[in-house]
Amino acid sequence: MNDFKDKVVYQIYPKSFMDSNGDGFGDLKGVTAKLDYLADLGVDYLWLTPFFPSPQRDNGYDVADYRAVDPRYGTMEDLEELIREADRRGIGLMLDMVFNHTSTEHEWFKKALAGDKKYQDYYIFKDGTPDCCPTNWVSKFGGPAWEYVPWLGKWYLHLYDVMQADLNWENPAVREEMADILRFWKAKGIKGFRFDVINVISKPEVYEDDFEGDGRRFYTDGRNVHKYLKELVAAGGIDGMITVGEMSSTTLENCIDYTAEGNHELTMCFNFHHLKVDYKDGQKWELREPDYLAMKKLFQTWQEGMQAHGGWNALFWCNHDQPRAVSRFGSDTTYWKESAEMLAVAIHFMRGTPYIYQGEELGMTNPHFTKIEQYRDVESLNYYRILREQDKTEAETLDIIAQRSRDDSRTPMQWDASENAGFTTGAPWIGIADNYKAINAAAQMDAPDSIRSFYKTLVALRKKMPVISAGKIEFLYPDNADLLAYRRYDGETELLVLCNLREREIAKPLPVGWTDAEKLLGNYPDTADTLRPYECVVLKK
């Protein structure tokens, strides 16, 4: 039995959450200090992005030691206190495991570079000459996916940054190291794990050029990935714990296999297809208006497909890699509150486990930076250079980055209207959104009609109503590009969810039998015969 159906996970990016010592960086003591805020929201788990020792080339996703705490975030004692204090409030901690690659500063990689054959086999090294990469694969961060090491006469694979060397999962010693890391953290009282890009760990037997793409078809959901996951879960002793896999460019069929209960792999999956509907020609760094019909079709395919075959979805709009949803799919000006609440309803009533990213419950927006110097994200800085080389103007380039950068969601949590939004008494590591005096936790905590109070209601309803956590789902009006509509039902209760995706009034179609249904929830105080801009309504019978 999946015990996580009525649970809600809150994602924390520690670097930007709360700074307890005034150095400008969020830390573990900062998280502990805000546990009452999180307990009040009603969330069950906190997923913390990596706080392990790291050169911070990719904000901690370049891990140099999987069993320690980076001094910038505090000490192991701070973490143990956080685990204890969270536990006392009925909240479990989930850690982020970056198992596809390590930092090139990791002890294993240093030994590999020093010529140690054992540790070279921990990574993917290929013999070659400096003028010819082993394949033409492209890194996810731009540029070649291989780096040459002259004194070894070898190339190593890095699907991400050049300082993130891919691990060789074909090597049983690597797989045992990963399982041992899970055992270590489980013994510390960690209650769950999120696995970073876990579906790219299984590489091909033969490395060949990709003349149709960037190489991803050769390693995405690779030939041994299900075998490796089953082994990792069993050897790590984590079967039955809450686990979520970040799945890059995956398929519905694979995610069913990853999450079906009898397979003993993961409890749920993140997939990102619905967050690519505003990519022009599938390209992240090319802008277009969101294709809501495509988004609806994706929701329906994944929701109904997972339901039919026993899979389980993670539900989300936001994370540390995505722009803020209210800026992206809503309005962060005129209809800020309405669109933030509509987007919340759209996914919180679906079949799956909802994830709330820090500040999402406040309606935090993109910061709308205007200078490249304001950005810290390695991907954004790389693409600034690439886009300028493609002859895009400075203004065009900055507009694209302002809408697409991972830094959009990494600006500090807006706690109150004081200097630096109450995040730090020092100089923050990255700038704070200018609107923090209006959009902050203190302003919303006790306001019954705030976005935060709305989120609190959504969390409580999932716990109270089995139809939300365990009922079936059926999508309605699939060809209506303005309206997301679906029905939840379980034999006792029925819910009808209607979400206006547009910044204008639209018709409000009601299926037969719903005219006199009770209004469970809405983001406008009264009821109308139409759906007003970004209006959502949930009916019950």
Regions found by a protein language model. Name each.
Residues 4-5, 216-217, 227-229, 233-236, ...:
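Loop/helix patches that line or flank the sugar-binding groove of alpha-linked glycan CAZymes
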